[in-house]
Amino acid sequence: MLIRKPYSIEATDIEVPVSFRQQPMNGRMAAMRRRNFLYGGLGALAACGQTEDSPQSTGSLERVRWRMVTSWPPNFPGHGTSANRLAQRLEELSGGRIEVSVFAGGELVPALEVLNVVSQGQIELGHSAPIYWRGQIPAAQLFGSVPFGMLPNEFNAWLYFGGGLELWQEAYAPLGVIPFPAGNTGSQMGGWFNQEINSVEDLNGLKMRIPGLGGEVMQKAGVLPVIIPVSDIYTALQTGTIDATEWVGPYNDMAAGLHEAAEYYYYPGWQEPSGTLECLVSMEAYNSLSDELKTIVRTACIAENDYILSEFNARNQRALKVLVEEHGVKLRRFPDDVLEVLRDFSIEVMEDLAAENPMSGRVYESYKVFATEIGAWLRITEGSITEARGSL
């Protein structure tokens, strides 16, 4: 497995080198201007992503050499290291028959072009998040995160036993891409702000980095949503290009240095109660595999989906303590009246999305029914147990 490493970040590290946190935005723009050149290079590399034996082969000689492009900075804690680990797991489970070279966002293609190059068959694998594909696949938002929606364990139950995964793959099929759940950040935080939020009026006019359905909800509240890659967030927040941002949770947010650029850290993360990461597989490349290697691809994604959720839950609680106790971050809860307004706006956004096209309507109906049913069960079980146990 080849992993590009401009710098090294161990999975146990919290801080990120200054070279990442303070990367100039114009450097990223220069990378974008090289886009045509990079895409031309993809064609020259096409021979690398080949299956050496026929699709029907089940023998030990079957070999594939694939490339994975991601939406994350190199080795970025959580997201980036998850992509590396998935590539390694594919190689190990296949006994070396699947070799994956990993390219971070911007190394081969821009971070937000991952879906496009996999769809075009130029790249075999992508590691990204459904929230970025609003323009290409409106229904994808419902697999990324739904404001005030299901938590990770509820979401996974819907995917595997409620028909969610079948709908997800049906939604992406017209683009020639097969999505698999390959990670979950867990429940996220509400974001970093350079001013206190005491009422809905305080949101009006703010420029905030917030993608997905959460961004559409915030827009209804008067916020100007901005979508920029993670590598640009720190500089944008520090220079005042944006007034606020949400990213993930304490572990990733501290790694990105966001506590150095904003004073207030808000919760709950109503906009992303469950943050899905996805492995995008070229349908053509996947169909060229033997049944055995197809099973290995699916199994590796399932394993990573579970593993990284556990990692985020473990690391986030430790990182939050460091942020508050050592860095003096001001932790704040969104006022109840603000959450109520945002919840009402969320329903409007979801209903508008469901009305856009039949696929979005089917996904939303399935999601909503399952969320209602499993929510009633979890309030009786996990919710009541958590409340009853107090502090052990």
Regions found by a protein language model. Give the residues of each.
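N-terminal secretory signal peptides
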Residues: 1-32, 43
